[in-house]
Amino acid sequence: MAHFKPLGKKLRLAKALKQNRSVPIWVIIKTNRRFRDHPKRRHWRRTKLKA
């Protein structure tokens, strides 16, 4: 990836990075393990972004 990125692309990449987290422990406990993982989790090598 280029060192210089347009601001819009940088913001989209930052949003994707924040979205790509596991479900917090407190949510798993509170929902009685109903939500252990989320289906939109993305692996950097398998699925590429359209950013």
Swiss-Prot record:
State the similarity comment: Belongs to the eukaryotic ribosomal protein eL39 family.
Q: Which InterPro entries match?
A: Ribosomal_eL39, Ribosomal_eL39_CS, Ribosomal_eL39_dom_sf
**Keyword Phosphoprotein included in the entry's annotation:** no
Q: Which domain of life does the UniProt lineage start with?
A: Archaea
Q: Biological process (GO) annotations?
A: translation
List the keywords (alphabetical).
Answer: Ribonucleoprotein, Ribosomal protein
What is this protein's name?
Answer: Large ribosomal subunit protein eL39
